[in-house]
Regions:
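An N-terminus-focused feature that recognizes amino-terminal "leader" regions
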Residues: 17-85, 92-99, 107-108, 112, ...
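Vicinal oxygen chelate
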Residues: 3, 15, 21-30, 49-51, 59-64, 82-113, 130-135, ...
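Conserved active-site tyrosine of GNAT-family acetyltransferases
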Residues: 35-40, 63, 114, 139, ...
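Acidic, Ala/Val/Gly-enriched low-complexity intrinsically disordered segments
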Residues: 4-5, 10
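Surface-exposed interaction/gating patches
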Residues: 165-255, 259-264, 282
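Extended intrinsically disordered, low-complexity coil regions enriched in Ser, Thr, Gly, Ala
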Residues: 33-42, 47, 94, 150, ...
């Protein structure tokens, strides 16, 4: 979809932007054990929630990682699909890179650490920011970005060998590969809407509003020659990127705004137990989510000081607990 009027007509402060930072990023991976070890050991994140895929009938883990208390904008979630054997194809019109923020000056530490763990990591730069570029064991691109504007505390966990000088601070953003640069630019600045802060041969960059003052971004990479990637929940691909609306009122107002622009396939609100979600596909197909956390948050089914320590199911899956547990891929958590 391309809008009839070009970018720039939506003014900041018009009351339409209902976003306050990132909520989470979600990808479909391969093996459960390699996924869990990658995030909790190599990257030093905490296990925040261990549950199952709420959609469909396949017994698949849904694993959440982030800061110890599960703060919004630190959460990465995964669906490991090795046992079902469902795999996707990485390509254009799809989210391409998971980006997390690290302290300035820590890139060399991470290059050494990641290479030492058997993951090929190199230092690079895009939009003037130093990055460590590497991949999840299943092949999904990741970057650790030295973000001088990130005031969050680093995530530090005993036994990992990662200190406050190196710890990941949370989500920096995500990069999306597109074939149609103009249509995506319109979606980002008019539908969501986000402020465009860079437009160059490297791509487009949009700032995610954040009242805490943490600079977070969406990057759009123009790759017209790259074949279309898959949209389904399938191993080896990023499924969606979720923006935080803070509450239900903001979510529903933004949903109505997006639907009114012609995105009539934006989903109804879905109950994700810990948060409520609406999903919308950008013009090429990359999936975005609008989410807000319910008052109980991660402590809805576990003690607040023990989140992510047990396997939990939503109430509507309790009658399938034994069946689903038997069908899950074995792993040591």
């Amino acid at each position: 979809m391309t809008f009839a009027v070009r970018t720039g007509r939506v003014k900041e402060g018009n009351g339409m932007s209902k976003i306050n930072g990132w909520h989470h990023l979600t990808l479909s991976t391969d093996g459960v054990q390699e996924d869990y070890d990658f995030y909790t050991k190599t990257l030093g994140l905490y296990s925040v929630k261990r549950t199952v895929l709420f959609d469909g009938v396949l017994p698949v883990y849904h694993l959440y990682y982030g800061a110890k208390g599960g703060a919004a904008s630190t959460i990465i979630t995964t669906f490991p699909f090795r046992k079902p054997g469902v795999y996707g194809r990485r390509g254009s019109n799809q989210s391409k890179v998971i980006m997390q923020s690290i302290p300035v000056g820590s890139a060399d530490f991470w290059v050494e650490r990641l290479n030492g763990a058997g993951l090929t990591a190199v230092k690079g730069s895009r939009f003037g920011l130093t990055r460590v570029m590497f991949a999840h064991p299943c092949g999904i691109a990741h970057e650790l970005v030295e973000n001088p504007a990130d005031t969050r505390d680093p995530i530090v966990k005993d036994g990992t060998g990662i200190t406050a000088a190196q710890g990941i601070k949370g989500i920096y953003g995500g990069a999306v590969s597109v074939q149609d640069r103009t249509a995506m630019d319109d979606f980002m600045t008019i539908a969501l809407p986000l402020k465009k802060v860079a437009d160059s041969s490297e791509g487009l960059m949009y700032e995610v509003p954040q009242t805490a003052g943490v600079v977070q971004m969406v990057e759009v990479l123009h790759e017209p020659g790259v074949p279309q990637g898959t949209w389904t929940l399938a191993g080896g691909t990023i499924h969606h990127m979720a923006l935080n609306t803070g509450d239900e009122d903001n979510q529903l107002k933004l949903r109505a705004h997006i639907e009114g622009l012609g995105f009539t396939d934006i989903s109804e609100q879905k109950d994700r137990n810990y948060f409520k979600s609406c999903y919308v596909r950008s013009p090429g197909g990359a999936l975005f989510e609008l989410a807000w956390t319910v008052p109980e948050g991660w402590a809805k089914d576990e003690p607040a000081d023990a989140i992510g320590s047990t396997l939990v199911f939503p109430p509507w899956f309790e009658d399938r607990r034994a069946e689903m547990e038997a069908g899950l891929e074995p792993a040591a958590f």
